[in-house]
């Protein structure tokens, strides 16, 4: 019985990165051997055991065989006769198909070290095509390391999409990989890879439809709506924004794909037009509620947020109420963060100031100065409970109006200069 450190731990060690999780493979053993040594079985689908002391995962070396379409359609064979190389051969990419023995020696039968040095993602064997999740994983690794994908691998990924393998992916796995990819340093790269292999059209057709849709060059020097979406997503990542914020950045402009051709490159009403496509994506991916809600909120209101300097005080109050800013100020703030990414996610506009965020937050704080509890008590004491909401709005408007007037005056002064 021999044990080897495998997969991501070896890859990250060779890259000089912190090793977070260690996975081990055991050669020359079976389940009875592991149980006799105190290991605890945990794998439902595969022979995986927890070490009695470290609680790290140890898997028996195994081979796999495709039995049906989709990521779950596999049978496996785990026995004492399965070699380390056979186990490594079933893995997705060469950079993940390396092992390290107890003495520190690297076992690399498929050229993983060479590909690491060259910054290449390359599949180990044709068996890569048997698991459609590998399309998403490869795109995610590209986003993490900014590696290029080997020509033969991207070709194989295209064939998988054409053969309908991507259609077999279940929502939970798509969301799981998409969420991980969005949180990588370069999420733009993930979307680019998915588009290059054709998977974006299958998994996120609403995002794919943005590419080739023109925008006004004076607002968007990058012209293409899809490119702007990628730039907004990447800006959100560079800002260190959360998963819900990055997801909202990805979907914020879906309405531009719905713009009638005769009014292009203008996109009047794309904020409203995008709401239904955002809902469709949320439902299809089964996105978590906090992600889904923020994506819809940003899509619906980002243009209004941008144009705060043009709004009347009553409109501002209506927006604060409709976006639930009084009850959920943290979510309101995250929506404004995405608006910064939207503004700066344009060609040569990466450092454009966004005073609207601070102003919206100041408006919300000012409106909150109206003591709703006191107003309600006074109305009830006067027998005018039916006027509570109206009186609260009146007090909030009194707080908002001077702040908005000052902001507009400062804006006018800046424009004149």
UniProtKB/Swiss-Prot annotation:
InterPro entries: CCA_bact, HD/PDEase_dom, HD_domain, NT_sf, PolA_pol_head_dom, PolyA_RNA-bd, tRNA_CCA-adding_enzyme
EC numbers: 2.7.7.72, 3.1.3.-, 3.1.4.-
GO molecular function ontology, one term from the record: phosphatase activity
Recorded catalytic activity of this chain's protein: a tRNA precursor + 2 CTP + ATP = a tRNA with a 3' CCA end + 3 diphosphate; a tRNA with a 3' CCA end + 2 CTP + ATP = a tRNA with a 3' CCACCA end + 3 diphosphate
Subunit structure, interactors included: Monomer. Can also form homodimers and oligomers.
Domain characteristics, as noted in the entry: Comprises two domains: an N-terminal domain containing the nucleotidyltransferase activity and a C-terminal HD domain associated with both phosphodiesterase and phosphatase activities.
PANTHER family xref list: MULTIFUNCTIONAL CCA PROTEIN
Any further remark recorded for this protein: A single active site specifically recognizes both ATP and CTP and is responsible for their addition.
Name of the featured protein: Multifunctional CCA protein
Species name: Neisseria meningitidis serogroup C (strain 053442)
Classification lineage: Bacteria, Pseudomonadati, Pseudomonadota, Betaproteobacteria, Neisseriales
Gene from which the chain derives: cca
């Amino acid at each position: 019985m021999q044990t080897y450190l495998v997969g991501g731990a070896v890859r990250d060690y060779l890259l000089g990165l912190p090793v977070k999780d260690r996975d081990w493979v055991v050669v020359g053993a079976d389940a009875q051997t592991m149980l006799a040594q105190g290991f605890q079985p945990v794998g439902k689908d595969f022979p995986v055991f927890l070490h009695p002391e470290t609680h790290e995962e140890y898997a028996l070396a195994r081979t796999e065989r495709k039995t049906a379409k989709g990521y779950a359609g596999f049978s496996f064979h785990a026995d004492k006769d399965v070699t380390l190389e056979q186990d490594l051969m079933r893995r997705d990419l060469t950079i993940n198909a390396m092992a390290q023995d107890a003495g520190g020696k690297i076992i690399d039968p498929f050229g993983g070290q060479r590909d690491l040095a060259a910054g290449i993602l390359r599949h180990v064997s044709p068996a890569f095509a048997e698991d459609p999740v590998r399309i998403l994983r490869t795109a995610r690794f590209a986003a993490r390391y900014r590696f290029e994908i080997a020509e033969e691998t991207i070709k194989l990924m295209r064939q998988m999409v054409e053969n309908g393998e991507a259609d077999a992916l279940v929502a939970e796995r798509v969301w799981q990989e998409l969420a991980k990819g969005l949180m990588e340093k370069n999420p733009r790269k993930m979307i680019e890879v998915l588009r290059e292999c054709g998977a974006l059209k299958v998994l996120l057709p609403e995002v794919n439809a943005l590419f080739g849709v023109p925008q006004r060059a004076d607002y968007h020097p990058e012209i293409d709506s899809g490119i702007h979406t990628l730039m907004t997503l990447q800006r959100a990542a560079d800002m260190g924004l959360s998963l819900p914020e990055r997801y909202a950045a990805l979907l914020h402009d879906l309405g531009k794909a719905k713009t009638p051709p005769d009014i292009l490159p203008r996109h009047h009403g794309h904020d409203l037009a995008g709401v239904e496509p955002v809902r469709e994506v949320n439902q299809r991916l089964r996105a978590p509620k906090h992600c889904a809600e923020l994506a819809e909120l940003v899509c619906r209101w980002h243009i209004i947020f941008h144009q705060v300097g043009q709004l009347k005080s009553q409109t501002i109050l209506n927006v604060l109420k409709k976006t639930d800013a009084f009850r959920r100020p943290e979510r309101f703030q995250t929506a404004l963060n995405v608006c910064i990414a939207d503004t700066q996610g344009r060609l040569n506009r990466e450092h454009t100031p966004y005073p609207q965020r601070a102003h919206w937050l100041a408006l919300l704080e000012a409106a909150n100065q109206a003591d709703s509890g006191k107003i309600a008590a006074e109305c009830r004491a006067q027998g005018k409970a039916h006027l509570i909401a109206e009186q609260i709005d009146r007090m909030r408007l009194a707080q908002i109006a001077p702040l908005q007037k000052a902001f507009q005056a400062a804006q006018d002064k800046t424009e004149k200069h």
